[in-house]
């Protein structure tokens, strides 16, 4: 070869199928990577459906306007892939969340997988955040407040031991602020004022313990939104990159603000980030 190394040959040998009832070893460092490789060809071909995979957590989202055929065919495709690759879907743990903002929506059709009906729930915890059917994020805020208050207790204990303010601040950033800001791009802009006040109360308590104000959650959210928007613009493989290109003015090169008919969309990530970048905070 050109590098001076002798050519190498490689051959793979596959054993026959072996059945075991001991289960797979848990806690292996390579397990998430190996499972990701194993499921790499599990893709969703439907145009109006989106499949999100994170290790062994898989979600399938369908955008339904008039017909559910595309969404249901995507579900059938996923079930078929699992059957072909010796993966068993646990239907009892599979949940469906229906997001419908109509005033009087008709009852949704049940989703059937291998003869079992998938339970429809009002909220579901996925990748650490609770998603509800109205996208109000109140249940998620409640969970955040509970976890943050548990950590504030330890801050109070450290303060009673006269720990230095610097260490208290480090403890806050590592254990409390990380909880308050986790996935904040998805939910913070859409929170009601009541929920924002509950989160703000935690930062005020932490500020008193530390001795100086901590970073306001609104400031943290805005800085994070602007940074993420720039990352998306530079990443041509990102699903939202084309959406931003369509919003870019051909004359000035600035991003054109999204037209929002509802406060729900106006306060979501993309419209908010574009307003911040353009310097038109509202």
Residue ranges and their predicted role:
Residues 23, 58-83, 101:
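Catalytic palm subdomain of template-directed nucleic-acid polymerases
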Residues 1-54:
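Conserved polymerase palm-domain catalytic core
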Residues 67, 88-122:
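Short, conserved micro-motifs composed of acidic
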Residues 192-282:
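Short linear motifs embedded in intrinsically disordered, charge-biased segments
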Residues 51, 68-71, 75, 89, ...:
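Hydrophobic packing residues in well-ordered alpha-helices of helical domains and bundles
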Residues 115-186:
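Basic, alpha-helical interaction scaffolds
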């Amino acid at each position: 070869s050109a590098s001076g190394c002798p050519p190498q040959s490689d051959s793979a040998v596959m054993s026959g199928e072996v059945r075991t009832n001991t289960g797979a070893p848990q806690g292996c460092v390579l397990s998430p990577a190996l499972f990701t490789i194993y499921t790499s060809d599990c893709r969703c071909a439907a145009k109006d459906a989106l499949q999100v995979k994170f290790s062994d957590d898989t979600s399938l989202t369908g955008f339904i306007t008039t017909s559910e055929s595309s969404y249901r065919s995507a579900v059938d495709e996923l079930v078929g892939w699992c059957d072909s690759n010796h993966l068993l879907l646990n239907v009892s743990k599979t949940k469906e969340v229906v997001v419908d903002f109509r005033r009087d929506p008709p009852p949704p059709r049940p989703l059937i997988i291998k003869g079992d009906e998938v339970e429809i729930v009002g909220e579901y915890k996925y990748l650490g955040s609770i998603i509800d059917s109205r996208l109000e994020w109140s249940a998620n805020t409640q969970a955040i407040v509970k976890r943050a208050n548990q950590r504030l207790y330890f801050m109070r204990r450290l303060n009673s031991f006269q720990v230095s303010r610097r260490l208290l601040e480090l403890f806050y950033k590592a254990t409390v602020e990380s909880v308050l800001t986790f996935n904040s791009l998805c939910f913070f802009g859409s929170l009601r004022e009541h929920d924002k006040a509950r989160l703000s109360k935690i930062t005020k308590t932490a500020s008193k313990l530390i001795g100086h104000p901590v970073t306001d959650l609104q400031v943290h959210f805005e800085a994070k939104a602007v940074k993420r928007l720039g990352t998306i613009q530079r990443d041509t493989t990102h699903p939202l990159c084309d959406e931003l290109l369509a919003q870019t003015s051909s004359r000035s090169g600035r991003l054109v603000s999204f037209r929002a008919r509802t406060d729900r969309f106006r306060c979501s990530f993309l419209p908010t980030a574009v307003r911040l970048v353009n310097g038109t905070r509202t």
